[in-house]
């Protein structure tokens, strides 16, 4: 959790950093910022609702939360797995401006299942997210970060994008690592994608 808060603090320092020039040009990022960073959270863990989202909102940020519908609890009264979010919570997050998107219905690794089964898994999760949040997912995050080409061709259909690169932010990350990452993004005018799972439990917490 401390690393996550430091991550947000570091980005806050750079949130007003923009290029200045007298010439007219098209800005690459909103507000002519020097770089862009997406906060992404995998697997729909409960503390992403209780800890991550509130900390983002407190600082004026919003995140992208990719979920597996098969593991999401039905609602706040029907909890079968206390480590996972509920559809009610995801709806609330969506209403507050966070993106709730597709990570596969059952987190199926693209290399281990037939393509038609992968397609059904993606479509089923899209339908569940739309039905429960009212918003159709327009991005996709690859389960296990497996980007098998045949699977990618299915996943990109009707999307504005998929997560093809990411910077893992977990227990091995240090404040110095994050500072260097942000500095590099600014220097290169790049778009960084931070990937986090659990803050206090779960993968790479």
Q: What is each of the regions a protein language model found here?
A:
Residues 176-184:
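A short, acidic, amphipathic alpha-helical segment used as a generic capping/interface helix at domain edges
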Residues 159-170:
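Acidic, His- and aromatic-enriched active-site or binding-groove loops in soluble protein domains
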Residues 35-37, 57-150, 157-160, 189-202:
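Metal-dependent polysaccharide deacetylase catalytic core of the NodB/CE4 family, i.e.
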Residues 4-14:
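Sec-dependent N-terminal signal peptides
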Residues 2-3, 16-39, 47-51, 58, ...:
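N-terminal pre-catalytic segment of deacetylase/amide-hydrolase enzymes
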Residues 51-55, 150-154, 181:
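A short acidic, amphipathic alpha-helical/loop segment
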Residues 45-46, 106:
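Short, glycine/acidic-enriched loop or turn micro-motifs at the edges of active sites
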């Amino acid at each position: 959790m401390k690393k996550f808060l430091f991550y947000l603090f570091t980005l806050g320092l750079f949130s007003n950093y923009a290029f200045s020039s007298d010439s007219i040009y098209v800005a690459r990022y909103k507000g002519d910022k020097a770089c862009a960073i997406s906060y992404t959270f995998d697997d729909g863990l409960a503390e992403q609702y209780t800890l991550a989202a509130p900390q983002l909102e407190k600082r004026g940020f919003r995140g992208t939360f990719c979920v597996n519908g098969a593991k999401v609890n039905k609602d706040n009264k029907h909890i079968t797995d206390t480590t996972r979010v509920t559809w009610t919570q995801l709806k609330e997050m969506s209403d507050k401006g966070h993106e709730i998107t597709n990570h596969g219905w059952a987190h199926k690794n693209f290399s281990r299942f037939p393509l038609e089964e992968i397609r059904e898994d993606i479509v089923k999760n899209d339908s569940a997210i739309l039905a429960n949040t009212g918003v159709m997912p327009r991005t996709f995050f690859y389960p296990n970060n497996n980007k098998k080409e045949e699977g990618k061709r299915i996943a990109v259909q009707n999307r504005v994008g998929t997560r093809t690169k990411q910077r893992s932010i977990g227990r091995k990350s240090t404040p110095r690592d994050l500072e260097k990452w942000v500095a590099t993004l600014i220097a290169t005018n790049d778009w960084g994608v931070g990937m986090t799972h659990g803050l206090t439990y779960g993968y790479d917490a």
